[in-house]
Amino acid sequence: METRIFGRTEMPISILGFGCGAVGGLMVRGAPQDQERAVARALEVGINYFDTAVQYGHGASETNLGIVLAKLKPAQAFVGTKVRIPPEDFSRIDTAVADSLDGSLQRLGMDHVDIFHLHNAITVNGGGDTLSAKQVLEQVVPAFQKLQKSGKTRFLGITAVGETAALHQVVDANVFDSAQVSYNMLNASAAQPLPAGYPAQDYGRLFDHTQKAGVGVVGIRVLAGGALTGTAERHPIASPPPAPIGSALNYETDMERAQRLMPLVREGFVGSLPEAATRFAISHPAMGTILVGMATPDEFEAGLAAVLKGPLPQAALNRLATLAKGFVGEGR
């Protein structure tokens, strides 16, 4: 398993991380024996980053991950969790953040995590359940730093969802160590310019900003919430199709566009669409680790097999770029 140094943290993190989210659902709603089997297999092949959040199953993901790690006692496991601050707590961010992490640590059975990510979307002016860049830098950061000084988290992170200008501002402030970034075959604008008229949010080459600031990148929505699996079928324990992040305005449109990328399979570049999506995500050097949702140990094995084949060859990336140009001019 390839490892990459995660930004300025100097942590050697496996390029494939273990996602404990609610979309795939294994660590939220899976059978305990399947959870243990998948985590044990991940550790066996050298996966060392585990990503969870209190929002995943209202704490179930953290609890289940904590149980399994306590049983398996890995020599090295980096754990990241998150806090989503509700609007009613925007007037007490310091306390809300501290209380959330304390709850997470209790569920995980740990005295600290390696990365503590803000889960809220970040916008220029805030509003609703989003935080403004100003709120993040002036209120969230000091609260996070207090927890860092107390030893409850080693590093600070954001979820890079929201308005592009605000995300650039927060990354450029050089105070966060990690950013979870949506990056997939339907929207690669974190890495490259979007063609004019392309129907997706333009992340404005966010990777240029993370690399300059020494921010490690966790790739999320690698399979676009399931759209890039190439099938409408979802495992019984998986979540319903989630709202897209950064790509189309609805999941059905993402599904339709994903089907138009199938020439990658038919022309022999890859064995399957999810393989293409997974290998695409690790093809950029700014990527520190990627998270692929899973409902079963078998789905984990499929993601693992794809990563072990390595990044997509340049010919496949060129073919993908040509296919994606077909989306230009369509409504988002």
Question: Which sequence ranges carry the predicted segments?
Answer:
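Acidic-and-aromatic substrate-binding clefts and catalytic sites of carbohydrate-active enzymes
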Residues: L26-G30, A53-E62, P86-T95, T123-N125, ...
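Short, acidic/polar
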Residues: R29-A42, R92-R107, G162-V170, A277
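Alpha-helix-loop-beta-strand connector modules within alpha/beta enzyme cores
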Residues: T63-T81, L137-S150
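Active-site groove signature of glycoside hydrolases
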Residues: L105-T130
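N-terminal binding-site loop/beta-alpha segment at the start of enzyme catalytic domains
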Residues: M1-A77
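Conserved, mostly hydrophobic/aromatic
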Residues: F6, F18, F50, L65, ...
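Beta/alpha (TIM)-barrel catalytic core signal, keyed to glycine-rich beta->alpha loops juxtaposed to Asp/Glu
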Residues: A121-G331
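Acidic (Asp/Glu)-rich catalytic clusters
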Residues: R8-E10, G66-Q76, L105-D111, V170-N174, ...
